[in-house]
């Protein structure tokens, strides 16, 4: 009895020293997509458990374990073509991150992160995913310097999507290793450099860890800041250089994103105009959809407007539209591809229940020979998330 009491007392003492919190998320997502006459249905059921422990004043450990069941149901046309419905179970350690902060002189600090966590480049496009990495973040009054290096080959191919022209993953249940890249990044941000403007530089490398034949170097620059009162801009441009032996159409590529946003200050209303340009040979590390039909980021110019508002505290509404153009092999604007729209409604039903509905559709230019017989592509999504 005395041992049980001492053990219980020790546990209470440990939790008082190391603050501990945990919780979970249950969600279901339904997709209806493809041309209106050939719609397909996908169902995702997901659950995750997370925990956070403060291991002292400046050290934190966080983790997130994820399970998902995905059903891709073949429609009638796909069944006639020989395709069957597929069902995939996914199990993943979404994140495991140890973070420590070291306070230095002159209001400077050094932050160390180790484990598996999300990484984003300036554009949010080139590399926007999880990474098993070591990261250093040095912060001063005049500059922010970031460095990280990591490996993608231990990630779950079912939960990340990376571009590789030759990697074929194993068809293992639950977990299969992803495309193996050795990734490194160094970036410098100069906040409020002049006239409240922010400037940033970054350099990325992605080396093919399998045979070093498909290698990438990315160099990026970013500008952002106020133009006048509530009017702001953001500009990023990333240049890609191909260094491997894998045959390429071109050894150079470019991604440029520009946005001007007006913050009204009323009901969180934001109105923005944006443009995204990708040259013919640009290939990011993370495979990201750029159009409503699921097209990858490749050889496209997209320009449009976007608006969002919170008419009441728990409701978020957004609406956007874009004109899309193909980019030719010489990187000039080639042909008008089509027009797309997107809409989203997100409602916080209760503190722990979130409802999210979205719709998007692209209408192809029927006068363009490349899309003469393509029907409009529709994408509908309904998502319910319960937190506990």
Question: What kind of region is each of these model predictions?
Answer:
Residues 1-4:
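Positively charged n-region of N-terminal signal peptides that target proteins for export
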Residues 20-42, 274-276:
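Short glycine/proline- and aromatic-enriched beta-strand/turn motifs that initiate or cap beta-hairpins
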Residues 21, 60, 104-111, 120-121, ...:
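Signature for the C-terminal beta-barrel architecture of outer-membrane proteins
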Residues 33-45, 53-112, 118-128, 243-250, ...:
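Surface-exposed loop and membrane-interface regions of Gram-negative outer-membrane beta-barrel proteins
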Residues 283-300:
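Flexible internal linker/loop segments at domain or repeat junctions
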Residues 374-388:
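Outer-membrane beta-barrel "beta-signal"
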């Amino acid at each position: 009895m005395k041992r049980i009491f001492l053990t219980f007392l020790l546990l209470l003492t440990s939790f008082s020293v190391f603050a501990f919190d945990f919780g979970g998320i249950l969600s279901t997502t339904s997709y209806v997509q493809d041309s209106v006459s050939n719609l397909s249905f996908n169902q995702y059921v997901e659950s995750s458990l997370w925990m956070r422990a403060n291991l002292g004043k400046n050290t934190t450990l966080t983790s997130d374990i994820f399970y998902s069941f995905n059903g891709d149901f073949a429609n009638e046309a796909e069944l006639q073509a020989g395709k069957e419905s597929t069902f995939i179970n996914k199990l993943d350690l979404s994140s495991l991150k140890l973070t420590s902060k070291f306070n230095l002189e002159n209001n400077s600090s050094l932050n160390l992160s180790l484990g598996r966590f999300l990484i984003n480049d300036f554009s949010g496009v080139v590399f926007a995913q999880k990474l098993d990495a070591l990261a250093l973040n040095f912060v001063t009054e005049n500059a922010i310097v970031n460095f990280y290096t990591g490996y993608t080959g231990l990630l779950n191919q079912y939960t990340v999507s990376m571009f590789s022209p030759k990697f074929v993953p194993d068809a293992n249940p639950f977990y299969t290793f992803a495309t193996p890249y050795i990734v490194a990044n160094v970036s410098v941000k100069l906040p409020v450099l002049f006239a409240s403007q922010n400037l940033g530089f970054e350099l990325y490398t992605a080396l093919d860890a399998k045979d070093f034949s498909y290698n990438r170097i990315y160099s990026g620059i970013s500008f952002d800041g106020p133009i006048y009162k509530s009017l702001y801009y953001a500009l990023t441009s990333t240049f890609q250089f191909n260094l491997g032996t894998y045959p390429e159409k071109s050894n150079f590529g470019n991604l440029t994103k520009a946005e001007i946003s007006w913050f009204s200050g009323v009901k969180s209303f934001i109105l923005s105009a944006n443009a995204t340009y990708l040259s013919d040979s640009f290939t990011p590390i993370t495979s990201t959809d750029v159009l409503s039909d699921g097209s990858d980021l490749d050889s496209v110019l997209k320009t449009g407007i976007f608006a969002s508002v919170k008419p009441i505290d728990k409701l978020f509404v957004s609406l956007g539209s874009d004109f899309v153009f193909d980019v030719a092999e010489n990187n000039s604007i080639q042909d008008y591809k089509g027009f797309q729209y997107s809409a989203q409604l997100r409602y916080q039903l209760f503190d722990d229940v979130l409802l999210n509905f979205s719709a998007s559709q692209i209408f192809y230019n029927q006068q363009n020979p490349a899309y003469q017989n393509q029907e409009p592509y529709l994408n509908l999504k309904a998502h319910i998330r319960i937190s506990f």
